[in-house]
């Protein structure tokens, strides 16, 4: 008996998830360190906050077997990420939401934010250093966000950044899930 198109898409989606998870499965035992869960989720197009990761997602993943010593099993991760994807729990913010956030940091309306100010805000999100970006995430963000063509490369022109970011994220997600959606067409 042949699988329905919905079942085929689910099988392909599971394959994409398994492949992404496998990149971080250092020992080959179908587990990853809990610190990698957010990275894998973002790769798969879900963008939870650090507090959601720490307070909701990771505890749920470790709840199945607390003796795993910080290791998350593939089965627990797959179950969680399939629910997140189907319910659109952590889909990326749209460009208007992102622009509104940047405008809060630019009360003068200059159209840019100094990268040092941005570093300060992102390293202490919510007023707590523990909620901020990790150093590697910070350097990756700043490298991507700064205007390299400007005479003052310490500025982040946020409208350009948001346009670039949303286009790149949409393209990545579309490419990643193209096969899982049945190939060919543009993602909705």
Regions found by a protein language model. Name each.
Residues 1-63:
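The feature marks the first
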Residues 60-112, 119-132, 136-188:
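EF-hand and EF-hand-like Ca2+-sensor regions
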């Amino acid at each position: 008996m042949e699988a329905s198109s919905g079942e085929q898409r689910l099988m392909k989606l599971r394959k994409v998830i398994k492949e992404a998870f496998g990149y971080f499965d250092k020992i080959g035992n179908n587990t990853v360190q809990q610190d990698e869960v957010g990275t894998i989720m973002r790769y798969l197009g879900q963008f939870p906050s650090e507090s959601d990761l720490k307070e909701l997602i990771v505890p749920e993943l470790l709840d199945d077997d607390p003796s795993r010593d910080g290791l998350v099993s593939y089965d627990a991760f797959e179950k969680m990420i399939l629910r997140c994807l189907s319910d659109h729990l952590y889909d990326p913010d749209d460009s208007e939401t992102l622009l509104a956030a940047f405008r809060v940091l630019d009360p003068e309306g200059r159209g840019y934010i100094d990268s040092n100010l941005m570093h300060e805000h992102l390293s202490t999100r919510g007023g707590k250093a523990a909620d901020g970006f990790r150093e590697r995430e910070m350097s990756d963000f700043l490298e991507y966000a700064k205007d390299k063509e400007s005479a003052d490369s310490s500025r982040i022109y946020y409208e350009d950044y948001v346009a670039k970011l949303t286009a790149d994220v949409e393209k990545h997600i579309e490419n990643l899930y193209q096969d899982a959606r049945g190939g060919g067409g543009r993602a909705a």
